[in-house]
Swiss-Prot record:
Co-factor(s): Zn(2+)
Domain Peptidase M12B, first and last residues per copy: 6-202
Protein known as: Snake venom metalloproteinase atroxlysin-1
Organism this protein belongs to: Bothrops atrox
Tissues where this protein is expressed: Expressed by the venom gland.
Residue numbers annotated as active site: 143
EC number of the protein: 3.4.24.-
Amino acid sequence: TPEQQRYVDLFIVVDHGMFMKYNGNSDKIRRRIHQMVNIMKEAYSTMYIDILLTGVEIWSNKDLINVQPAAPQTLDSFGEWRKTDLLNRKSHDNAQLLTSTDFNGPTIGLAYVGSMCDPKRSTGVIQDHSEQDLMVAITMAHELGHNLGISHDTGSCSCGGYSCIMSPVLSHEPSKYFSDCSYIQCWDFIMKENPQCILNKR
């Protein structure tokens, strides 16, 4: 129903390594981000959540935090930076870091769970792990899902015969669908915690 619509004002930060990976072409990076956000919008529309890109910051000179292969440390640093720096400059609900750094092990993204609207913890870090916009967009949708209180799908969760967004492992052919479990968990979190920042559009 429309009255339960929520709005996530999303801010995306691009680290210096990713800037260099795209040969310093900010326009190309921005185009990629817009494609990714459109995919995320589509994915979240069935959840009655609108994803609105409120800003992009590209670290074209140098990284403003220590980005490292240990994803938990990078997430911690990014959260602190968001809380003390970015939030003072730009109004937004959630921030995601895109990095060219190859995180340790099979990790391609990491985020806090059930943390939407928290100054430090409404954040995630995403490895730019594929040439395909879809693959990285689904990874970001997945990490944002954790911020919205959604945990990984178990065997009984389904999204109509596809590989769902909150699957513990990214499929080679991911879908833009959340499972029935994800919908229930997301709205349980929203109804119980009532994160204020996503009630309005900026």
